[in-house]
Regions:
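N-terminal Rossmann-like NAD(P)+-binding subdomain of aldehyde/semialdehyde dehydrogenases
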Residues: 1-152
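Secondary-structure boundary motif
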Residues: 83, 207-210
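Conserved small-residue-rich beta-alpha loop and adjacent elements
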Residues: 127-208
C-alpha cells in the first residue's frame, strides 16, 4: 500500500506508527495507511520480512530464562505502565487519540487499567490453570504412565501470531504477558485504530531491560 493507493495528498497530516522489532524501535514513513474508523493517515516503516522471522537454527530468546524471572519482569512492567510519567504511554495515548473513536479520557483509563493484568498472583494463576506442572516451562520433568514407562516432558517455546483488536488496549498487555510466560517467539498484527499500544508496552519493557 502506498500514498496513491489510499488517496492521500501531500497536505494530509500523517501520524507516525513505529514498529518494535527484535528489541529495536523501527521508525519511518515508507508505507501510508488509513485508520478504519476515522480515516486518519498513519505511516509505518518498511521492514525486511526476513528480520521478522526468528531463525530456526537459534534457540528462542526466552527458552532458558526462568519463569519466575519472567513474571518478576512483567510485574515491574505493570508498575512502569501505571507511572504517569511513562513517556512511551503518554506518546501512545497522544497518537491513539488521533486515530481512535473513543475519547482521550477513556483511552487513558483503558491503558492504565490494562496494566492491572500484570499482577504476580494473577500471572501465576494463569500459568497454573494451563499447565499441570509449571516446572515444565523451565526444565525437563520426569513422567511415568500407567504401564510404568518413563519419559521426560518439557514445554518448548512456540511461535505465536497475535491478531489484536483495536478497541481494547488490555488485549495487547495480555498477549504480550501470555506470550512471554510460555517463552514464545511472538508476532503481533495490530489494528489500524490502535497500532500504538503494543509498541508502547514493548518500549517500556526494553527501557527496564537496559
Amino acid at each position: 500500500m502506498n500514498a496513491l493507493s489510499v488517496g492521500l495528498t501531500p497536505a494530509d497530516a500523517v501520524v507516525s506508527a513505529p514498529f518494535f522489532l527484535r528489541g529495536e524501535l523501527c521508525e519511518g514513513q515508507d508505507v501510508i495507511h488509513r485508520s478504519r474508523d476515522l480515516g486518519v493517515a498513519f505511516a509505518t516503516p518498511e521492514i525486511a520480512l526476513d528480520r521478522v522471522v526468528h531463525p530456526r537454527n537459534q534457540v528462542p530468546p526466552l527458552l532458558n530464562v526462568p519463569l519466575a524471572e519472567i513474571i518478576d519482569f512483567l510485574v515491574e512492567t505493570g508498575q512502569r505502565l501505571r507511572d504517569p510519567g511513562n513517556p512511551f504511554v503518554r506518546e501512545c495515548v497522544d497518537r491513539m487519540a488521533l486515530t481512535h473513536v473513543l475519547p482521550r479520557a477513556v483511552l487513558e483509563e483503558q491503558t492504565r487499567s490494562a496494566a492491572a493484568y500484570l499482577d504476580r498472583r494473577l500471572l501465576r494463576t494463569v500459568v497454573e490453570q494451563n499447565f499441570p506442572d509449571p516446572k515444565a516451562l523451565d526444565e525437563w520433568v520426569p513422567k511415568q504412565d500407567f504401564t510404568g514407562r518413563k519419559s521426560f516432558v518439557r514445554a518448548f517455546a512456540p511461535r505465536l501470531i497475535h491478531v489484536l483488536p483495536g478497541n481494547s488496549p488490555g488485549v495487547a498487555v495480555k498477549s504480550i504477558a501470555q506470550g512471554a510466560m510460555v517463552k514464545a517467539v511472538n508476532l503481533f498484527k495490530m489494528s489500524s485504530s490502535d497500532p500504538f499500544t503494543t509498541v508502547a508496552v514493548l518500549r517500556t519493557m526494553a527501557d527496564i531491560d537496559r
